[in-house]
């Protein structure tokens, strides 16, 4: 299940206990990141700027 975000960069996110799913406004593709803990998913959902959170805590750290 994808959760819509109020973000100029990210349209929706999801998490299944191990994988984080991210869909950006610029693409219909849903990107999958493996080994992402709940704390990162929750931080992304609750962030004032999900795009900034994504770049600081997810991009380049999870594949």
Q: Which ranges hold each PLM region?
A:
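Acidic/histidine-enriched, beta-strand-rich ligand/metal-binding domains
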Residues: 1-63
């Amino acid at each position: 299940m994808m959760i819509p975000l109020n973000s100029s960069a990210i349209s929706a996110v999801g998490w299944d206990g191990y994988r984080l799913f991210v869909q950006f406004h610029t693409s219909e593709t849903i990107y999958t990141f493996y080994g992402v803990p709940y704390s990162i998913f929750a931080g992304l959902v609750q962030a004032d700027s999900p795009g900034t959170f994504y770049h600081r805590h997810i991009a380049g750290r999870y594949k």
